[in-house]
Amino acid sequence: MSHDRSVNVSHDAVIAKPERGTMLQSFSPRSHGSKGYSLPQDSEENRGSVGQSAGQSSTSVVDQVRSPADDAGVTSSSTICPAPVCRQFWKAGSYNDELSSKSQQPNGKNYLHVHPMFLHSNATSHKWAFGAVAELLDNAVDEIQNGATFVIVDKTTNPRDGATALLIQDDGGGMDPQAMRHCMGFGFSDKKSDSAIGRYGNGFKTSTMRLGADVIVFSRHSKNQTLTQSIGLLSYTYLTRTGHDRIVVPILDYEFNASAGEFKTLQDREHFISSLSILLEWSPFSTEAELLQQFDDVGPHGTKVIIYNMWLNSDAKLELDFDSVAEDILIEGSIKKTGSKIVNDHIASRFSYSLRVYLSILYLRIPETFKIILRGKVVEHHNVADDLMHPQYILYKPQAAGSEEALVVTTIGFLKEAPKVNLHGFCVYHKNRLIMPFWQVINYSSSRGRGVVGVLEANFVEPTHNKQDFEKTVLLQKLENRLKEMTVEYWSCHCVLIGYQVNKKPRLQIPQKVQPAGRQALSPPPGFQAVFPQGNTTSLPRVSTQPVLLEKRKEHPDSVASAALKRKVGNDDFTVPGHIRVEQFIHGSASQSQDIETVKLMEENKKLRAKCLDRKVRSQNLEVKAMNLRSELENYKSEYERLMVELQALDLVKDEHRRNVNT
């Protein structure tokens, strides 16, 4: 970046104007059926010369949609020699730019620009490649309100070199020319809906640049009987190889001309040719006709994103593996078979390297009218809560700075595979989107907490901009502490149901204190109870040397067990007076059967009480209904009697009328 006292930041696409020698010689608007323009593509020298000319020109043309902060001056590129982009993402940002000169404007002033290296550094927020894919799917899911019915994630091929590329396509509302510039720029976001996942207007850039060095976008939009289509290119390869010191985004805009029956360009001739020349040099398509053919399967509205020059891992293999499983996309080298087969095959283990598994739990709710199609096959939606045994529903009302947030319902239970799996964690969603999958809130070395999984939607905490974590706030810390408590409380109350035995910890021997002669022993005050063991036996119940207040303790409204368990939840070896400790896992013991039977009876009793309450409510409703019917019946009786009186009166009138006629 270069700057001085006068700072001018432009978020719109800025297109470098080629030198005279690189300008196309002819121009005319063409429809989709035309062959379009083409440029020489034979050698790296041609590619470099055009790029250098575009980068080192003395003038620039700002894209058609301007903002008050548009940089209306010229641009110059760095004097650094073009260098190929390293194909490994985590090394692609380490090139020497010390020779880069400051961007000079004709009036002698320096302006603040976004350097191409920001594309790479901005994308490093995505440590996990699937997190970047999820960001792109969020854009499609946000389009459900505009009629989107599907999003496609698939492998495609770069026609220029045959290399693998990633395709993401949806049939949402699409983007008009202005929206395309906001998408390619920084800091624009028009997602004001409370249900929208996107917020910062940065996700498209971070996610696409994390998956590959270059991305080309095709979008068609229809509004007020106006049909437009736009093509935009964000190319890290182009910017670095041509030595640009600012981000340059070529964009082509077309509008359908109903009278001519074809698409016409919206930009002026010079601007259009400048943008087209860059697109044909650095995109996967070498002619305008090939570019326009990409709209053939888009339909009247929708967006197609193609990410190419995809990043390699440290073994020089594609970071995303498209070949191992025909209907899935894997992260190369991330499959680790460390545990038993049942653990390795579980969704909590596979989501980290299988995109199909991750997408199945990515959204808490998906409309039946919307489909996620991965490699040609629909992703089946999976609700983790459906995998739980003995589920409990715990209410939690977060509070911070004296204000109360919305009530949160947490579903918690044992995995169906428990106790054979050593998995644990909470799937925490925000506005329907999974932010933290299987978040482990406790560290367990023994059995405590194993197999306990929960699901909740925490809209009261804000996710980080990469949507893979939450901002570290007081609310998040309180939530984490409460989830720790829930885990231990649930485990302590229900572990016998999956085959664990709970034993009381051996009691400590506390000698009886002898009162000094002449001193009267003090008794505890009313409302307190102190228990002291006698003798040397260790089989007596656990004792407490602290007085216990017999007053009912103030419980948290969503508490399900004693508050004593809340003292040291994170420590696996903690003991609490009067509470149980899990010692070992056993099969077939008499005490285990007894405990399980007791818990089952308690659950059955709870169900019966719920049924009784339900029937009582239904009985009351029926009584009210009966009273209403009786009241209506009385009204009908009164009406009937009134009508009978009127009928009798009419009969009398008729009789009198007949007599008068006869006489």
UniProtKB/Swiss-Prot annotation:
Primary location group: nucleus
Phenotype upon gene inactivation: Accumulation of siRNAs and slight reductions of repressive epigenetic modifications (e.g. decreases in DNA methylation and H3K9me2 and increase in H3ac) at target sequences, especially in the shoot apical meristem after rosette leaves development, leading to derepression of silenced-genes. Stochastic silencing phenotype due to randomized RNA-directed DNA methylation (RdDM). Impaired gene silencing due to decondensation of chromocenters leading to the derepression of DNA-methylated genes and transposable elements (TEs); DNA and histone methylation seems normal.
Residues forming coiled coils: 614-659
Residue numbers spanned by region Disordered: 1-77
Regulation of protein activity: Stimulated by DMS3.
EC numbers: 3.6.-.-
Polar residues bias: start-end ranges: 49-62
Regions that span the bilayer: none
Pfam family, one: HATPase_c_3
Keyword Membrane: no
Cofactor: Mg(2+); Mn(2+)
Sequence motif: Nuclear localization signal, positions: 552-559
GO cellular component terms listed in the entry, alphabetical order: chloroplast envelope; nucleus; plasmodesma
Family classification: Belongs to the MORC ATPase protein family.
Name assigned to this protein: Protein MICRORCHIDIA 6
Source organism per UniProt: Arabidopsis thaliana (Mouse-ear cress)
Gene name, Swiss-Prot/TrEMBL: MORC6
